[in-house]
């Protein structure tokens, strides 16, 4: 007998709306629990099972003032749409040599 795996459903459309409403940006890519904003400015990560707060990571190259303003807009829009978002730190995209793949290095604030 095969073991059934539970499928995790995320509120991608709500995150898409929050991102567009707050920053005027579209979603460039979504993979598993990660949602990448246009231009790689930030990543929103859906919480682990049972969690209620979205995690937000900004590109390490994003200017501090822009990061603060965008996060404040995201937090306000998330609240207005019944969600919460927390700033978790910065990330860096690293191109793998000779491959069309990237690694993502998260720099946690904790």
Which residue ranges define each predicted feature?
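Short secondary-structure junctions
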Residues: 21-30, 81-90
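A generic structural signal for short, non-catalytic loop/turn and secondary-structure boundary residues
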Residues: 20, 37, 49, 97-99
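Long, continuous compositionally biased terminal/linker segments
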Residues: 37-81, 105-110
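Terminal, regulation- and interaction-focused segments at domain boundaries
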Residues: 1-17, 58
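Alpha-helical scaffold elements within enzyme catalytic domains, especially in hydrolases
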Residues: 17-18, 77
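Short linear loop/turn motifs
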Residues: 29-38
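Glycine-rich, aromatic-bearing surface loops/beta-hairpins
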Residues: 88-110
């Amino acid at each position: 007998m095969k073991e059934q795996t539970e499928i995790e459903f995320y509120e991608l459309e709500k995150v898409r709306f929050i991102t567009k409403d707050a920053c005027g940006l579209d979603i460039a890519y979504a993979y598993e629990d990660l949602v990448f904003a246009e231009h790689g400015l930030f990543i929103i990560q859906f919480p682990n099972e049972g969690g209620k707060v979205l995690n937000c990571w900004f590109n390490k190259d994003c200017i501090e003032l822009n990061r603060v303003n965008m996060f404040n807009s995201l937090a306000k829009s998330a609240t207005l749409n019944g969600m919460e978002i927390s700033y978790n730190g910065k990330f860096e995209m690293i191109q793998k040599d000779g491959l069309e793949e990237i690694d993502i290095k998260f720099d946690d604030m904790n």
